[in-house]
UniProtKB/Swiss-Prot annotation:
GO terms for molecular function: translation elongation factor activity. It comes from the Archaea. Coiled coil: none annotated. The keyword Protein biosynthesis applies. The keyword Protein biosynthesis applies. This is Elongation factor 1-beta. Gene3D superfamilies: 3.30.70.60. The lineage of its organism: Archaea, Methanobacteriati, Methanobacteriota, Stenosarchaea group, Methanomicrobia. NCBIfam families: aEF-1_beta, PRK00435.1. It comes from Methanosarcina mazei (strain ATCC BAA-159 / DSM 3647 / Goe1 / Go1 / JCM 11833 / OCM 88). Pfam families: EF1_GNE. Keywords: Elongation factor, Protein biosynthesis. Belongs to the EF-1-beta/EF-1-delta family.
């Protein structure tokens, strides 16, 4: 088994969401077996709203990104989580 790089888009609840605090909260809930790859990047969406792009390295096993998706979705200030890309490395 190898590893998978997964890029996730995290949408905050509103333009008023504290993105600095949200980034820290996301880093604190990364599940065991997943590692943050690089920084959490802000991506402008529209009208001042910014998404957060998180790249994780996870094990290549069934359910790969699901624990991270579920953990991120439970963080206060997160509207939704979407997997943008996933590929073996």
């Amino acid at each position: 088994m190898g590893d998978v790089a997964a890029k996730l888009k995290i949408m905050p609840e509103s333009v008023d969401t504290d993105l600095v605090g949200l980034k820290e909260n996301l880093k604190n809930v990364i599940p065991a077996g997943a590692q943050l790859h690089g920084d959490i990047v802000e991506e402008p969406i529209a009208f001042g709203l910014k998404a957060l792009i998180v790249t994780l390295i996870v094990n290549d096993e069934e359910g790969g990104t699901e624990p991270a998706e579920e953990a991120f979705a439970k963080v206060s200030g997160v509207e939704n989580v979407q997997v943008l890309e996933a590929y073996r490395i």
